[in-house]
UniProtKB/Swiss-Prot annotation:
Heme b b566 binds at residues 97, 196. The cytochrome bc1 complex contains 3 respiratory subunits (MT-CYB, CYC1 and UQCRFS1), 2 core proteins (UQCRC1 and UQCRC2) and probably 6 low-molecular weight proteins. Belongs to the cytochrome b family. The lineage of its organism: Eukaryota, Metazoa, Chordata, Craniata, Vertebrata. It comes from Amia calva (Bowfin). It is found in: Mitochondrion inner membrane. Its main location: mitochondrion. This is Cytochrome b. A ubiquinone binds at residue 201. GO terms for biological process: mitochondrial electron transport, ubiquinol to cytochrome c.
Amino acid sequence: MATIRKTHPLISIINGAFIDLPAPVNISVWWNFGSLLGLCLITQIVTGLFLAMHFTSDISLAFSSVAHICRDVNYGWFLRNIHANGASLFFICLYLHIARGLYYGSYLYKETWNVGVVLFLLVMMTAFVGYVLPWGQMSFWGATVITNLLSAFPYIGDTLVQWIWGGFSVDNATLTRFFTFHFLFPFVIAGASMIHLLFLHETGSNNPLGLNSNVDKITFHPYFSYKDLLGFIILLAGLMFLTLFSPNLLGDPENFTPANPLVTPPHIKPEWYFLFAYAILRSIPNKLGGVLALLFSILILMIVPITHTSKQRSSTFRPLTQILFWTLVADMFILTWIGGQPVEHPFIIIGQIASIIYFALFLVFAPLAGWVENKMLSW
C-alpha cells in the first residue's frame, strides 16, 4: 500500500519536490545555493515580519522607530541586525548561484534561467526599497538619486518620477509606498521561486559534467537533504558571526544620521551588493545611456542561452571559457570597488574599461570562445 506522502494531493507535491526527487549523484556543493537562498528568504520574511510590527512608516518617526526597535524591543537589535546582514548573505548566495549557472551551463534550461533573472530583479527591487525605510541620510539620498534616474526616459520621465514619489520630492508618500512594496515583494519572490522550482523539476538538475544524468540518479532525501542541512548550518553560523561580532561592517556610517534634504552626503553610494551595477551606470556620461547600461547589465543574463555556441554544455572541459569566466569574476570585483570610489581620475577610466569588458565578455568573447573550442574539438 502506498504511503500518505505519495497519495495525499498536497503532501505528494512536497514529496516530489523534496523527498523522492531524482537528483544527479555528482552535483557538488555549488548546487547548495538554491536551498540556501530559500533559507535566506524565509529568514528575511520572518525577521521582517517582526520588524514591521514595530516600525512606523512616517518620515518624522521612521528613524526613531528603528532606534526604538534596537533599544527597547526584546531582541530588537538582534532582529534588525539579522535582517540587515541577512540581505548581504542573500546577495552573496545569489551571486554564487548565478555564477554556478554560468559556469556549468545551467542557463540552457531557458525557462528556469529566465524566471531566475526575473527573481534577481525582484530581489534587487526589494533590497532597494528596504534600504530607504530606516530614513537615514543614505536612505534618503539613495532613494532620491536612483528614482531620479527614471527622469531619463524621454517624454514620460518627469511625470514617472513624480508618480513614484507621490509628490515633488522624496517625502512621506514615498516612504509609505516603499514600505508597502518592501512588505509585498518577498511574497511575490516566494511565489516566483515556486515557478522557478516547477520549471527546474520539469527537466531535472544539471550536473558538473553537463551531461545527461538520467541513468544515474539518487533520491533527494536523505542524501541531498542532509547535504543542504550542512550548508544551512554554515550559512546560519556565518550570519550569527557577522551579526553578533560586526553588525555594522557592511553598512554605511552615513545612515546613522537622520535624513536631511538640506545636506547632501559627500559620496552617495548604494549597499555593496549594488556597487557593480552603480559603477556601470556611472561609467556612461549620458543619463539615459547610463540607465540603459544599468538595465542591460542585468538583462544581459537573459541572452546568455542564445549566445551559447559550444557543443559542450559545462565549462568543465573548456579552458578558454574558464579563463573568460574567471575574468568576469575579477571584472565584477573591480566594478564593485569602483562603484564605491569617488568620481575622479583614475577611477572614471577604470570603471569605463571594466564596463566595456563586462559587456564584451557576454556579447563577444564567450560566443567566440565557444566557436574556437568547437574548432579545436574537430582538429
